[in-house]
Amino acid sequence: MNKGNLIKNYAVALFNNAIVDNIQDKIFEEITSINRIITDNFDIREFLFSPIVNKNDKINAVNSLAKNIKISTIVQNFLLLLVKNSRTAILSNIVDAYNTLLYESKNIKIVQVISANKLQPKEQEWIKSRIEKELNQKTEILFDIDNTIIGGIVIKYDSMLQDYSIKGSLEKITKALKTVNIAV
């Protein structure tokens, strides 16, 4: 099984368990919080991801963590499953996949907007409203910065890519010039 399918299967399993008790949002908050703790703490991350550390020690650590931060049994059991199957290293990917499932269940499209500089709140609101109008759907916009695009924005959702960046325009011009054999 490829990694993408594996990640999606774990996310779907967790999501389906959350649906049973109608706690999808709560589970997302918990799993995101756990992921942040693991990501932000080098020692915890190395301990849980290390193939050298005994699984029973990892299980005890997860149980202790769950007790200290008071997470649901669903999330605790899910983390234990990841430990037992040596899959803790893909937790961040599973959280992202779960997030996608959560938004899809609410008919909200996740859209990534990349700009060369940090956008002001009014600019973000304007972009969000334009995208929602174009898609005729509610969106969750993830604003990222990539100064290599020079200026403009790049919009990504599903398998779509709309490149309104200066870098993208320059690449198109370069490609067009090459097709007519003009040296660039």
Swiss-Prot record:
Its main location: membrane. It holds the Pfam family OSCP. It is found in: Cell inner membrane. The keyword Transport applies. Keywords: ATP synthesis, Cell inner membrane, Cell membrane, CF(1), Hydrogen ion transport, Ion transport, Membrane, Transport. It comes from the Bacteria. F-type ATPases have 2 components, F(1) - the catalytic core - and F(0) - the membrane proton channel. F(1) has five subunits: alpha(3), beta(3), gamma(1), delta(1), epsilon(1). F(0) has three main subunits: a(1), b(2) and c(10-14). The alpha and beta chains form an alternating ring which encloses part of the gamma chain. F(1) is attached to F(0) by a central stalk formed by the gamma and epsilon chains, while a peripheral stalk is formed by the delta and b chains. This is ATP synthase subunit delta. It comes from Rickettsia rickettsii (strain Sheila Smith).
